[in-house]
A protein has these predicted regions:
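Long, domain-scale functional regions
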Residues: 1-229
C-alpha cells in the first residue's frame, strides 16, 4: 500500500493517509479512484445534527449531549473498520500508535469576524435536532471561513476518537479514522472563502482529483448535516 505523511503526532509518531497501491513496485503520486479505499456515505441519514458524528446519539433529541453521545456507529466508521479488518492483522495493529482522531463537534454561532457572509447570521450554536448550527471548523478551515486558522487541538473528550480511554473516548475498534479540515489546510489547501479554487491545485501535496470525507462537521441547516469534504 502507498501512504502520504500528514503530520507528526503529539507523541512523535506520524499520521498517514492512504494513497493507493504501488504501480510496478513504486508509490508514485496517484490521483482518482485509485487513491481511495472505496466509497461510502458519511451517514445514511442527514436530517439532524446528530449525523455529523463519526458516532452519534439520538436524532430528535432536545439536548446537545443526547444528540452527540457516542452510541451509534456512523456509516463511514463501519466502512473504514471493515476495510481495516480485511487488510491489517494484530501484529500490524500492535505497531500503530493509538493517536487521537478528532471529530470536532464543538459549536460556534455565526461571527462576522470569522464568517463574513451575513446570509448566515441566523446560524446558532445549539447543535441538536434540526436547529441551524455552525460547528467549529466552519470558522477555522472551511469554504465559509473569512480566513484559515487551523487548529490541531481537540477540545472535547467526547470527540477524541481513540481505542484506549486514557487520552480519548475509547470508542475506536481499530487505530484508523479520517483526516480533518484543519490538517488539510495545514498540508497546503486554502479552503477559506477568498480562495475557493485552491482545491483544484494539482501541485498540492494532498491533491487527488477526488472528493474525500474529512472528520470535521461544518454545519447543519435546511435538513442537511454537513461534514467537510
Amino acid at each position: 500500500m502507498c501512504w502520504k505523511i500528514i503530520r507528526t503526532t503529539e507523541n512523535n509518531g506520524i499520521k498517514i493517509i492512504y494513497n493507493g497501491i504501488p504501480t510496478a513496485g513504486k508509490c508514485e503520486t496517484q490521483t482518482g479512484d485509485a487513491t481511495q479505499i472505496g466509497t461510502s456515505r458519511f451517514n445514511e441519514s442527514y436530517d439532524d445534527n446528530a449525523y455529523v458524528g463519526y458516532m452519534y446519539g439520538t436524532a430528535g433529541s432536545s439536548t446537545y449531549a443526547a444528540t452527540h453521545a457516542n452510541t451509534n456507529e456512523s456509516t463511514i466508521k463501519k466502512y473504514i473498520d471493515n476495510w481495516y479488518k480485511a487488510n491489517f492483522d494484530e501484529i500490524a495493529t500492535s505497531k500503530l500508535e493509538d493517536t487521537v482522531f478528532c471529530n470536532d463537534r464543538t459549536t460556534k454561532a455565526y461571527d462576522a469576524k470569522t464568517i463574513g457572509n451575513t446570509s448566515f447570521s441566523s446560524y446558532g450554536d445549539l447543535g441538536y435536532g434540526t436547529n441551524v448550527t455552525f460547528y467549529g471548523a466552519a470558522h477555522r478551515a472551511s469554504y465559509y471561513s473569512n480566513d484559515s486558522n487551523p487548529s490541531l487541538v481537540c477540545q472535547n473528550q467526547n470527540d477524541k476518537f481513540t481505542i484506549d480511554n486514557q487520552n480519548g473516548n475509547g470508542k475506536l475498534t481499530y487505530p484508523v479514522g479520517l483526516i480533518t479540515l484543519d490538517e488539510v489546510v495545514l498540508a497546503g489547501f486554502n479552503t477559506h472563502d477568498s480562495n475557493i479554487s485552491d482545491y483544484k491545485d494539482t501541485t498540492n501535496y494532498l491533491y487527488t482529483n477526488s472528493i474525500y470525507w474529512t472528520f470535521s462537521p461544518v454545519m447543519s441547516a435546511g435538513g442537511n448535516a454537513t461534514v467537510g469534504n
